[in-house]
Design a protein with these regions (language model features):
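Alpha-helix-loop-beta-strand connector modules within alpha/beta enzyme cores
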Residues: 9, 30-50, 98-113, 192-210
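Catalytic-face loop-and-helix region of soluble metabolic enzyme cores
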Residues: 110-174
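Active-site beta->alpha loop and helix N-cap motifs at the rims of alpha/beta catalytic domains
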Residues: 1-67, 176, 186
């Protein structure tokens, strides 16, 4: 299957993730086992994303996450792979920046793409946070979900993006290089939001963050 996709669709980049079940299905129980087979490299895959957990994982212990990230760093260097970290979605910049710095201190050298929840109602964000089982962000969004009047209010990630931008600018060694959006509020809405930011159609707010300028 991989060989067919790689040839017919010219696939050169994949995201390899594992976990999420109590009992592994099949012969692999973690992403490193797949990486070590060499099947990706053999089929011309030149760019590989692996999971990042700024808030930890409900399925994997923190010390195991740390060990796995160190192993992936070593493997990327050994195999000369173009590898990067793709993270779960988050809501608070301070937490993400602290995680990145700690991972760097622990030896991480892989560039990082941070998961950003696209514009969506608080009700929708709360539902996805529940499904993902993430911790601090769950508590963050739960506080807002507790206000019934705000449940259908569309939440923008402007404070998260602004906070990350400030942190990245202040720490030149920061390994956060890209963002990727989770289109919880719909693909079109998320795409329009991302395009507006890319085009610079934003206005800074006096109380922090920014807002999109509607054309």
């Amino acid at each position: 299957i991989l060989s067919t996709f790689a040839k017919q669709a010219s696939v050169k980049e994949v995201l390899v993730i594992g976990g999420g079940v109590d009992k592994p299905i099949g012969e692999f129980d973690c992403s490193m086992q797949i990486l070590k087979t060499g099947i990706l490299q053999a089929n011309g895959i030149t760019k590989i994303g692996v999971a990042g957990h700024p808030e930890g994982s409900p399925d994997i212990a923190d010390n195991e996450i740390k060990r796995a990230l160190q192993e992936k760093n070593e493997f990327a260097i050994k195999e000369n792979l173009n590898m990067y970290i793709e993270t779960q979605f988050c809501f608070e910049a301070e937490m993400v920046l602290a995680w990145e710095k700690k991972a760097r201190e622990d030896g991480n050298q892989l560039p990082i793409r941070i998961g950003i929840p696209g514009p969506a109602t608080i009700k929708t964000l709360f539902r996805f946070a529940q499904i993902s089982g993430i911790g601090p962000s769950m508590r963050f969004i739960a506080k807002q979900a507790g206000n019934v009047a705000k449940l259908m209010t569309v939440q923008s990630p402007h404070l998260l993006l602004a906070g990350l931008a400030e942190g990245m600018a202040a720490d030149k060694a920061c390994l956060i290089k890209h963002f990727h959006y989770y289109p919880f509020g719909g693909f079109v809405r998320t795409a329009k939001y991302a395009r507006a930011i890319s085009d610079g159609n934003v206005s800074l707010k006096t109380n922090g963050g920014f807002e999109i300028i509607e054309n």
